[in-house]
Amino acid sequence: MKHILTILTALFVVLSASAKTPNNDLIFANINDANSPFYYPNLMLRYKEGKPMSEDEYHHLYYGYAFQPSYKPLEVNPSMNRVQEIMARISIDKPSVHDIDELIAAGIAAMEHDPFSPTLLNILVYAYGASGDKVRELAYSDHLNGILRCIEQSGDGLKEKSPMHIIMFSHGTDFIASKSIGYRKGQIMSRTVEFVPFDYPRNKVKGYYFDYSRVYWNKPDNYTFKRERTWQFNNLKPQEYK
C-alpha cells in the first residue's frame, strides 16, 4: 500500500481564477432542465459511477444538492458514526480485509446522507486503495479534488463579503484540514456567514469565511443545532497520481 499516512496535504492545485459564486436561480434552472448537460439525475448517476466530471459539473452537482429532497443537513448521519467507530479501531498500516470491507460499506451508506463530504471521500480513497481497487481509488480521489476545488472557487474566503460557499458545516472545516491547517472554534458573523480561525495565521491570513446559508433553508422552527468540531481527516493522505 503506497499511502503515506500523515496529515492530509491537498492534492489539487490552487487556482487563481476569479471566484465562481453560486447563482442559485441559474443552478436550479439548469439541474431541472432534462435537456441541460447539468440535469441533476444524470449528474448524480455519473458521480456515483465514478465518471470523470468537469468543474462546471461539480459546481452544479454540489450546490444543486441543496435543492434535492434528500438534502437534510441538520439530520444526524448514523452511518457516519459507524465510519468513525471503524476508523478508531482499524490498523491503518495493515488493515484486515474484514475491516476494509466494513469501512467501505459504512462509507457508502454515510454518503447517502452526505454524498460530498470531503472526509468520507478521503476515507473511501484510502479504503479502496487498501483493498487494491485502483479504479475506485482514483475515482474517489478525483471526486475529492473536484469538491474541494468547487468550494475554493466559490469565494476567496478572506472577507465576510466574499465567503466560500458550503452545503454542510463540516465541509468548511474539512476544506481547511485538507490544507494541513489547524483551526479553532468557528465564530458566527451573521445569519449566513461563519468565520473559522486558524490555529495560527498563515501568510497574514487568520482564517476563512464560509457561507452556510443553504444549511438553514428548510430548518424546522423549533430546531436548535449543536455542531461538533472534532471530526477531520483521520490523518490520511490519499494516493498521488502522476
Feature roles, as predicted:
Residues M1-N23:
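Bacterial Sec-dependent N-terminal signal peptides
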Residues K20-I100, K161-K242:
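N-terminal alpha-helical interaction modules that lie
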Residues K48-E49, I108-D114, H143-C150:
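Solenoid-like repeat scaffolds
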Residues S79-R82, L121-L124, Y128:
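TPR repeat positional signature
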Residues D99, A106-G107, Y140-H143:
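Alpha-helical solenoid repeat scaffolds, predominantly canonical TPR units
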Residues P118-T119, G146-E160:
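Boundary/linker segments of alpha-helical solenoid repeat arrays
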Residues G129-E152:
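TPR/TPR-like (Sel1-like) alpha-helical repeat modules
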